[in-house]
Each structure stands twice: as C-alpha cells, then as structure tokens.
C-alpha cells in the first residue's frame, strides 16, 4: 500500500498503543472439509446362519481417515492451515546480506535471536502464503470485461476464506484477514483506489491496473502488489518497475541507508523507456511515493524508503519489516490526491472529541471493534450491514479521528505501474516474505 513522501500521509503515524490488548486467538481456526466420511455402520447378515444356528456377522470395514486437502481449490477456499497441517508455513526467499557485519553477533547468537521470533515468523509466513495463492489465482483469472467490484470481492473473499476468518463477527477481522483494502488503480491512477458501492467501472483491454492488497495474521501484515496489462506495448513499463523493486530489495539490509536505496531504485528505473503510439516515454519514478516500514496493525510505520536518491541517512535495522515498493510512470512522475475517497483509517493520535452526532459515535464503535488501526473501505462497512453512515463518517474525518485517503494520480493520459514485496530484516538473513514463483 503506497506511502506518500514527504510523509504527510497520516498512516505513517499509526502505532499500536497497547500491544498487550492485541487479540490473540489462534488465526488458524475454521474448518473446510472436502472428503465425505466413507465409513459404514455394522451390518448383520440374517440370511446366512453359521453352524450351530449363530448368525454370521460381516467384518467391520476399517474407518477411512479424513485427509487434508493437498491442493488449493479454484477459486481459493481451502484453509492455508489445512494445506499445512503441521502449521509450518513456507519460508520466503532468504537472501544473504551484501556486506554482513560479523562483529554484531556470532552466527549462533543470530540463529538464537531468529528462533525467539518463531511465532512472529510463522504468522508472517501464514499471511504470505495466503497472499501468494490469492494473487496467483487473481492473475490467472482477471480479464478485460470484468467489473472492478467483482475483482475486488473475488480477492477479498479468497483471502478471508484462506485464513479462516470472515470478519463478520465483532473482532474477527482483527485476528486475521485483509491487511488493507484491495487497490485496483488504473492507468494514471497510481494508488488508493478501490470501488465503492455502486461502482460500474469495467476493466478494459488497454488498461494498466495495479493490484495492491494486504493479508494479516495476528496483526502481521504482508503488503505486496503487482501490475497487470493486456497490451504488450506496456511490457517495458512493467519490466522497469519490477526490476527497480528487485534492485531495492537486493540493496536492503542491516545498517543500509534509506537514501542510498532510493538512488539504486532510481538508476534502474530510469534506464528503461516505453513506446506508446509512436512516442517514446522515459520511465520516471513517482518521486513522492515511497516504500515504508510495517508495524503490528500499522501498515505505514515510521520509516520511508524513497524511490529516488535522497539525503536520508536513516538506516535499516535488525528486526525491521519493510514494504519495498516502486512506482513508475510515463507522466510527470508526481502524484496528487484526486477523486472519490474509498480508503480510510482510524488515527491512533486522534483527539478525544465529545461527538454530538449519534451516527458518528456508533460508527466509531464499529471501527474500533472491527478494524482498529487497520485501513478499511466503505465496502467493508456495507458488508457489516452499516447503512446511511456517510454523515457520521464525514464527521469523524472532520474531527480528526479518521483519516481519509483519496486516490493518488499522475497526469491524465499517462500510465503507471507498481511492484511491491514485504521483507523481514532478520538477524541472519533478509527474508523476502511475499516472494513467489510469479514475481
């Protein structure tokens, strides 16, 4: 999920104020069985008496054990926890640090530090596997002619099914589910667009669509995005942004300065150009969009990763979680806020306001109980059965309790692309937790 730079985006201020109050139920609950019980009741054969007049009983057939599914369904509906019954989820791509500082700790001590975070790592890998399976299904099935609403619902229904939390009961969505709404930003719109109720927008053959969604388990958010285009003329744009993201990931590591990562990303992206209708366009980094750290229940932490060279001397640190994302454009390489708002999040530094509007009070209670500090969209309120909430929502925004995040757009007629992965800066290696066979 995109972060603006400089960090005026208030999502970067979100923090977990009381980690001890974080919901702790096991995120792997829920059942989805596809095998029928093939066992039979005992039966006696009354028509074949044995010697001595005793009835001969049939031997009981052994009861067949129910087997866990071994592959995902289409659409994805099999729990990740059923596909991995030992609850040991696949690791991401583990990459050695380029310039390892051996003086920090011994390898044995590093491994010990890694083991201390086993629950944290497993939750992250659980969320990452759900993200991989859903996005790979989406990439195969999204086609021109589909509505954005159907695309978003297909992704979000699949995420909720795979983590086993539908989010319809109070607090359920805080255990596991969507980390933030599914962004479906098209062409010159770079980020923060998801359809509101009644949206009739249809994906077109010549569109370039960014698909950006998050999956969270116990507040550990995997943030990953990719771009789809159906016209091969846009391939160089997509290749430029994907290569830039991978360059940023390669450069990342303990004690690496964030401004230096931005310089590497910029150099790679600007080495590409794309020809559209006979005109050649340089691929420009969108300089006021950034990568960012991720904290529990907080999609935008306090650090930003620029995608152009800067003087930022802030360092990556052991234990950080980063979303490395880059955006490229055939336009001006700068975005502004424009269009109908769909994305919202409660501010953790919100003032204590004596709300006089009853609809605002009741809506705030719904937000606290179902989303906390996680971002959400209007469709999520609709799904919970909320009605006529816009007046209350606008009141919460005007009082500084909820932040609204409009779509971010470059100039009309331009095309933008995005690729993003979540990486864990572990003591021993950096783990590209969301890496898959697709990208």
UniProtKB/Swiss-Prot annotation:
A divalent metal cation 1 binds at residues 212, 223, 420. InterPro entries: Creatinase/aminopeptidase-like (IPR036005), Met_Aminopeptidase_Type2 (IPR050247), Pept_M24 (IPR000994), Pept_M24_MAP (IPR001714), Pept_M24A_MAP2 (IPR002468), Pept_M24A_MAP2_BS (IPR018349), WH-like_DNA-bd_sf (IPR036388), WH_DNA-bd_sf (IPR036390). It is found in: Cytoplasm. It comes from the Eukaryota. Residues 54-68 have a biased composition (Basic residues). Binds 2 divalent metal cations per subunit. Has a high-affinity and a low affinity metal-binding site. The true nature of the physiological cofactor is under debate. The enzyme is active with cobalt, zinc, manganese or divalent iron ions. Most likely, methionine aminopeptidases function as mononuclear Fe(2+)-metalloproteases under physiological conditions, and the catalytically relevant metal-binding site has been assigned to the histidine-containing high-affinity site. PANTHER family: METHIONINE AMINOPEPTIDASE 2 (PTHR45777:SF2). Cotranslationally removes the N-terminal methionine from nascent proteins. The N-terminal methionine is often cleaved when the second residue in the primary sequence is small and uncharged (Met-Ala-, Cys, Gly, Pro, Ser, Thr, or Val). This is Methionine aminopeptidase 2-2. It comes from Chaetomium globosum (strain ATCC 6205 / CBS 148.51 / DSM 1962 / NBRC 6347 / NRRL 1970) (Soil fungus).
């Amino acid at each position: 999920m995109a972060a603006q730079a400089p960090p005026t985006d208030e999502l970067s201020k979100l923090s977990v104020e009381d980690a001890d109050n974080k919901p702790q139920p096991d995120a792997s609950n829920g059942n989805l069985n596809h095998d029928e019980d093939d066992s039979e009741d005992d039966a006696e054969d009354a028509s074949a008496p044995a010697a001595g007049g005793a009835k001969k009983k049939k031997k009981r057939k052994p009861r067949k054990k129910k087997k866990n599914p071994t592959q995902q369904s289409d659409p994805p509906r099999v729990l990740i926890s059923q596909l991995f019954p030992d609850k040991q989820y696949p690791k991401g791509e583990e990459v050695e640090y380029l310039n390892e500082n051996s003086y920090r700790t011994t390898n044995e001590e590093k491994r010990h530090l890694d083991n201390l975070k086993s629950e944290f790592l497993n939750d992250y890998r659980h969320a990452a596997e759900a993200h991989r399976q859903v996005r790979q299904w989406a990439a195969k099935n999204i086609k021109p002619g589909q509505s954005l609403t159907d695309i978003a619902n297909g992704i979000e229904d699949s995420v909720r099914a795979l983590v086993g939390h539908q989010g319809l009961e109070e607090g359920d969505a805080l255990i596991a589910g969507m980390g933030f709404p599914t962004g479906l930003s098209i062409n010159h719109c770079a980020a923060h667009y998801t359809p509101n109720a009644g949206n009739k927008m249809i994906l077109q053959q010549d569109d370039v669509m960014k698909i950006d969604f998050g999956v969270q388990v116990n507040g550990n958010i995997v943030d990953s995005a990719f771009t789809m285009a159906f016209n091969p003329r846009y391939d160089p744009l997509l290749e430029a942004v994907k290569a830039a993201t991978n360059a940023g990931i390669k450069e990342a590591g303990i004690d690496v300065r964030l401004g230096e990562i931005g310089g590497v990303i910029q150099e790679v992206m600007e080495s590409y150009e794309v020809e559209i209708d006979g005109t050649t366009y340089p691929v420009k980094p969108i300089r006021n969009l950034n990568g960012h750290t991720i904290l529990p229940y907080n999609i935008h932490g306090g650090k930003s990763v620029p995608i152009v060279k800067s003087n930022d001397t802030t360092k990556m640190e052991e234990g950080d979680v980063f979303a490395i994302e880059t955006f490229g454009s055939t336009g001006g390489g700068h975005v502004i806020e424009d269009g109908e708002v769909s994305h919202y999040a409660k501010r953790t530094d919100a003032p204590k306001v004596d709300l006089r509007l009853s609809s605002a009070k009741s809506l705030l209670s719904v937000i606290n109980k179902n989303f906390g500090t996680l971002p959400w969209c209007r469709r999520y309120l609709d799904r919970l059965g909320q009605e006529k909430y816009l007046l209350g929502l606008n009141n919460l925004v005007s009082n500084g309790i909820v932040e609204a995040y409009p779509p971010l757009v470059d100039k009309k007629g331009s095309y933008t692309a995005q690729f993003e992965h979540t990486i864990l800066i572990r003591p021993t290696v950096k783990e590209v937790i969301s890496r898959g066979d697709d990208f």
